[in-house]
Amino acid sequence: MSGKVWLVGAGPGDPELLTLKAVRALQDADVVMVDDLVNPSILEHCPSARLVRVGKRGGCRSTPQDFIQRLMLRHARQGRSVVRLKGGDPCIFGRAGEEAEWLARHGIDSEIVNGITAGLAGATACGIPLTYRGISRGVTLVTAHTQDDSPLAWEALARSGTTLVVYMGVARLAEIQAGLLAGGMAEDTPLAMIENATLGNQRECRSNLGELLRDAGRFALKSPAILVIGEVTRDIVSQPISLSA
């Protein structure tokens, strides 16, 4: 009898933001396949599982996606409960949809367990509400990294009127800035750069679109980091919003 694959979001980093369903999946797992951006302390929930490191991070040597999928398939066909543990939410730039579809084509049952995405949790940890009545009525989540390195429609995003949350953008700051300015976004549009969201070494830098490159250089911004762009970053909230229950 085949096992099952759980595509689990580990959240942004803070282990207290892990969902109860994710904890149960980890506790019941025979095999846990762990991404690079998962906080190691989260693995305390699966002390008896076999751990397999399948790191994927931009700019670094990564485990091939085909290898990851075939490894999930092999363990599931051997009747094991497999957790594919991903940072953030598996459905936000985490390829969960692709993996679930691939597993289904090969006759393997899977289930997605959502996690809190870094764009939301990082903004909240810095006192930034992504929507705010009268200021921002929508949010656009976008990755600056594409499979074929094709440019994004930054000009259209500049005209969306929503808060922009940019993932995987550290290496493309010049492209982001130029595209948004070309789309008519004002140079004084405020933004926040948030590195290592919700972790003990989280760092934050407030800037604006016109000074993005200068301030990112002075700040020595490094991955993993997100950009939050829009009026909601203008210190609406005077202190970080509590992430605890």
UniProtKB/Swiss-Prot annotation:
It catalyses: uroporphyrinogen III + 2 S-adenosyl-L-methionine = precorrin-2 + 2 S-adenosyl-L-homocysteine + H(+). Gene3D superfamilies: Cobalt-precorrin-4 Transmethylase, Domain 1, Methyltransferase, Cobalt-precorrin-4 Transmethylase, Domain 2. The keyword Metal-binding does not apply. One of its GO terms (molecular function) is uroporphyrin-III C-methyltransferase activity. Keywords: Cobalamin biosynthesis, Methyltransferase, Porphyrin biosynthesis, S-adenosyl-L-methionine, Transferase. It comes from the Bacteria. GO terms for biological process: cobalamin biosynthetic process; methylation; siroheme biosynthetic process. Its EC number is 2.1.1.107. Pathway: Cofactor biosynthesis; adenosylcobalamin biosynthesis; precorrin-2 from uroporphyrinogen III: step 1/1; Porphyrin-containing compound metabolism; siroheme biosynthesis; precorrin-2 from uroporphyrinogen III: step 1/1. Pfam families: TP_methylase. The keyword Methyltransferase applies. S-adenosyl-L-homocysteine binds at P12, G87, G88, D89, T117, A118, M168, A197, A225. It is a step in the biosynthesis of both cobalamin (vitamin B12) and siroheme. PANTHER family: S-ADENOSYL-L-METHIONINE-DEPENDENT UROPORPHYRINOGEN III METHYLTRANSFERASE, CHLOROPLASTIC (PTHR45790:SF3), SIROHEME SYNTHASE-RELATED (PTHR45790). Belongs to the precorrin methyltransferase family. This is Uroporphyrinogen-III C-methyltransferase. The gene is cobA.
